[in-house]
Amino acid sequence: MRFPKTLLAVLVILVCPCAFCYGQLSFSGVNGEKGYAALRGQYKLDLDNGLVLTPEYGYYRRSDKEEDEAGSTSRYGLNVSYEVTDDWTAYALARWVPLALDFQSIEYAAGVRWIPFYKKGMFKAPLLGLQAGQTRYDVYSDAQDNPLEHAYSPTETFARAEAETYARKLRLRGIYRKVIKYSSQPPSGVSTNWADVPFMVAVVQGFIKESSAVQLAYPTRNITPYASWVRYKYADHRAFATAVSAGIALHFWDMDFSGGVEVFEPKRQANRRTYFSMTVESKF
């Protein structure tokens, strides 16, 4: 699996600050059929004054095609969060997909996270979060790579809610994201090159209008098994698609290693896609 030269530059930018500050470095990747590959990396830089900077990079390769960097797309992002109090955190983020394969986008969002209490009954340290933002797309060809007469440039306005808590020895997480409106409805046959599915490393194509996801994990000192389930709907389809994942994370010193499987189940069983994922995290 080959990655572009820009990836090496990003890795240097992410890794070099680690010698001078406290933070967490993580990389996730998946491999699939016909050369499909996706990779994400981020460095959580804690400035120790309530401010946390998190630069991120993503890479997505659709196939083994040699043309145009093997059909690949990159995404760059920055998340800035500030701990207002012990219970409240505010953040803002921006993500940019530069023009590649007749597609580009820019996303910006802001949100808050709140811990209402630290322990009550069987629940410990619950976290609630709300986010709102917009994404602007520019699409110059349809899903069959035929050029469009006029570029399709919609803006989507979205909202996102998240919740996380420990219930005895289980860790529960949930995410719901919904597009409130598109500035113009996505026409049939026009797609995006980069769409996120909660708890999944793999990247999918298409305008995702709504998604809901839950994840269950059983953390222990050295091993944490986990499983995730996602239900999502494209803007041009009435039916929902499903994705599931499962895996095991191993903890050694300040390092975490995890491996698992991600399965995407569209409307037709023949289109099922299976990916093998791996994640490495290190604290400094």
Give the location of each predicted region.
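Bacterial N-terminal signal peptides
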Residues: 9-18
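Short glycine/proline- and aromatic-enriched beta-strand/turn motifs that initiate or cap beta-hairpins
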Residues: 21-67, 73, 132-139
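Short loop/turn motifs that connect adjacent beta-strands in outer-membrane beta-barrel proteins
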Residues: 21-22, 45-52, 83-89, 102, ...
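Sequence/structural signature of outer-membrane beta-barrel proteins
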Residues: 30-32, 58-66, 95-103, 115-119, ...
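Residues that define the transmembrane beta-barrel architecture of outer-membrane proteins
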Residues: 33-41, 70-76, 102-110, 153-159, ...
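Outer-membrane beta-barrel architecture
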Residues: 40-44, 77-81, 111-115, 160-164, ...
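Detector for outer-membrane/organellar transmembrane beta-barrel domains
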Residues: 49-50, 125-233
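Outer-membrane beta-barrel "beta-signal"
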Residues: 110-112, 248-253, 261, 271-284
